Amino acid sequence: SYKVSGGLHGVGVSVVNALSSKLELTIHRAGHIHQQEYKHGDPVYPLKVIGDIETTGTTVRFWPSAETFSQTIFNVDILARRLRELSFLNAGVRIVLRDERVALEHIFDLEVGLSEKSALDIAGLPGKLADCQEKDPALSELYLVEGDSAGGSAKQGRNRKMQAILPLKGKILNVERARFDKMISSQEVGTLITALGCGIGREEYNPDKLRYHKII
């Protein structure tokens, strides 16, 4: 049996539908909004047009069946790892993962594929970053804490609206003495650079893109 499925060979939506107590399908195509709903794998009504729209795309919402699964609560860390892997294989596709239970958002946006991947090509926010709801950098704060245990306590006591928490390992690297290639190959340094959002180096560094104007 699989602990985590990496793919269902093209029949994923059918399997998800069969294992869900409810599934809603909304399709934007040919200027119209099409919708259909299923319960326990069976259609509630035929595919119907419910409105007009100029954009295209598909939205699938599903509720895992408690009759099939003993655990129906999603683990956001597992989802984040899987979507990060998918971002490597789908260059140019922007993937956004939102956990509305704790106002957490991950963004995976890889401009190039695996053939040109480097340590800093991954523009997705770090998986351990508990981001804040505030989008204005001037009002946003980033707290760097040592270790996951401290990170857990900090996340519980923070103000989610304006305070972000990023757990890091202690004494990660002396970047003043390290070579540049060793510095960017450090997972912790790369995580910090990605979280700050302003890049590194003469060509990529842009202080205007700094995501937090207060870093503690």
From Swiss-Prot:
Gene3D superfamilies: 3.40.50.670, Histidine kinase-like ATPase, C-terminal domain (3.30.565.10). Disulfide bonds: none annotated. Its EC number is 5.6.2.2. It catalyses: ATP-dependent breakage, passage and rejoining of double-stranded DNA. GO terms for molecular function: ATP binding; DNA binding; DNA topoisomerase type II (double strand cut, ATP-hydrolyzing) activity. Keywords: ATP-binding, Cytoplasm, DNA-binding, Isomerase, Nucleotide-binding, Topoisomerase. It is found in: Cytoplasm. InterPro entries: HATPase_C_sf, Topo_IIA, Topo_IIA-like_dom_sf, Topo_IIA_B, Topo_IIA_B_C, TopoIIA_CS, TOPRIM_dom. GO terms for biological process: DNA topological change. The keyword Isomerase applies. Its main location: cytoplasm. Residues 140-216 form the Toprim domain. SMART domains: TOP2c. Few gyrases are as efficient as E.coli at forming negative supercoils. Not all organisms have 2 type II topoisomerases; in organisms with a single type II topoisomerase this enzyme also has to decatenate newly replicated chromosomes. Heterotetramer, composed of two GyrA and two GyrB chains. In the heterotetramer, GyrA contains the active site tyrosine that forms a transient covalent intermediate with DNA, while GyrB binds cofactors and catalyzes ATP hydrolysis. Belongs to the type II topoisomerase GyrB family. This is DNA gyrase subunit B. The gene is gyrB.
